[in-house]
């Protein structure tokens, strides 16, 4: 039974060792010397790359505008939702408020005496 647990580990480790032995180390100096030659682009490739980047930026800007419009429309829908006043709902609302407020509440936060010793029956000393 123990062999079945270790067999995938053994297979993976054997494959990793095989890959490590089959690869040869390349000096860092040769990589650095050859990189400027590999990064040269022709003028046509530069124009194509610039056009692709510009199209991507325009697409992202349109997506952000659509999301903002949907959020503006969605805010009226959330106002019509039925309110929930159970302890779980109130706790979730307070947690959401705290997470949205960020550092404002954290700067003014004063820790209270909370924990196993704070509420209910306390442990008695065994010395008595």
Curated annotation (Swiss-Prot):
Similarity comment: Belongs to the calcitonin family.
GO cellular component: axon; cytoplasm; extracellular region; extracellular space; neuron projection; neuronal cell body; terminal bouton
One GO term (biological process): negative regulation of ossification
Disulphide-bridged cysteine pairs: 84-89
PROSITE patterns: CALCITONIN
Transmembrane residue ranges: none
Tissue and organ expression note: Detected in nerve cells of cerebrum, hippocampus and pons/midbrain in newborns, and only in nerve cells of pons/midbrain in adult.
Keywords: Amidation, Cleavage on pair of basic residues, Disulfide bond, Hormone, Secreted, Signal
Cellular compartment(s): Secreted
A molecular function (GO) term: calcitonin receptor binding
Annotated signal sequence range: 1-25
Location of Phenylalanine amide modifications: 119
Protein name (database record): Calcitonin gene-related peptide 1
Disulfide bond recorded as keyword: yes
A Pfam short name: Calc_CGRP_IAPP
Record's function text: CGRP1/CALCA is a peptide hormone that induces vasodilation mediated by the CALCRL-RAMP1 receptor complex. Dilates a variety of vessels including the coronary, cerebral and systemic vasculature. Its abundance in the CNS also points toward a neurotransmitter or neuromodulator role. It also elevates platelet cAMP. CGRP1 can also bind and activate CALCR-RAMP1 (AMYR1) receptor complex.
């Amino acid at each position: 039974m123990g062999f079945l647990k270790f067999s995938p580990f053994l297979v993976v480790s054997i494959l990793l060792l095989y890959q490590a032995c089959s690869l040869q180390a390349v000096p860092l100096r040769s990589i650095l010397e050859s990189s400027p030659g590999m990064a040269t682009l022709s003028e046509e490739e530069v124009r194509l790359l610039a056009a692709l980047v510009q199209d991507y930026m325009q697409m992202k800007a349109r997506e952000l505008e659509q999301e903002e419009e949907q959020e503006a429309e969605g805010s009226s829908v959330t106002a019509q939702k039925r309110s929930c006043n159970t302890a779980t709902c109130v706790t979730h609302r307070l947690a959401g408020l705290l997470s949205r407020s960020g550092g404002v509440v954290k700067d003014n936060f004063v820790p209270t005496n909370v924990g196993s010793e704070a509420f209910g029956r306390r442990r008695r000393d065994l010395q008595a």
